[in-house]
From Swiss-Prot:
NCBIfam families associated with the record: moaC (TIGR00581), PRK09364.1 (NF006870)
Keyword Lyase: yes
Function summary: Catalyzes the conversion of (8S)-3',8-cyclo-7,8-dihydroguanosine 5'-triphosphate to cyclic pyranopterin monophosphate (cPMP).
Signal peptide region: none
Summary of subunit composition and partner proteins: Homohexamer; trimer of dimers.
Enzyme Commission no: 4.6.1.17
Species name: Yersinia pseudotuberculosis serotype O:3 (strain YPIII)
Active-site residues, Swiss-Prot/TrEMBL: 128
Protein name: Cyclic pyranopterin monophosphate synthase
Amino acids binding substrate: 75-77, 113-114
Gene that encodes it: moaC
Length: 159
């Protein structure tokens, strides 16, 4: 079994030292879902929400969140992201919104947490903007879809 990298030999949490690692191209993709009533989703699709464009706001929130992941997750490194993409897709057949994020960089550590944070905060933003209309929306699942680059190799979720 792989060891936890953020725990030292004394069992204490610490930030991993990546100074000796080589810089490599890295990418991670994540997804999140927000389930809601058909009427709430229709309001988003029609652009009739009184707070404005829900998708545009969620997209910007996701991008901002990826850039601030190191401030939110205690042991994450600050990263020089070269790409953050947040795609939002209304899925009326399932009464939900699907969010897919992609983060890239060339660096010494991966971008999985940035992709997951972007997806999570975009979902939370949709909830925040729509909670006046519907409070029982469900966020989830949130998961890593793929990651590439780095010492641990590539990962792709089984669909």
């Amino acid at each position: 079994m792989t060891q936890l990298t953020h725990i030292n030999t004394a069992g204490e949490a610490h930030m991993v030292d990546v100074s000796a690692k080589n810089e490599t191209a890295r990418e991670a993709r994540a997804e999140a879902f927000v389930d809601m009533q058909a009427a709430t989703l229709a309001m988003i699709i029609d652009g009739s929400h009184h707070k404005g464009d829900v998708f545009a706001t969620a997209r910007i929130a996701g991008i901002q969140a990826a850039k601030k992941t190191w401030e939110l997750i205690p042991l994450c490194h600050p990263l020089l992201l070269t790409k953050v993409e947040v795609k939002l897709e209304a899925q009326p057949e399932h009464n939900r919104v699907r969010i897919e994020t992609c983060c890239r960089l060339t660096g010494k550590t991966g971008v999985e947490m940035e992709a997951l944070t972007a997806a999570s905060v975009a979902a939370l933003t949709i909830y925040d903007m729509c909670k006046a209309v519907q409070k029982d929306m469900i966020i989830g699942p949130v998961r890593l879809l793929t990651k590439s680059g780095g010492k641990s190799g590539d990962f792709k979720v089984d669909i």
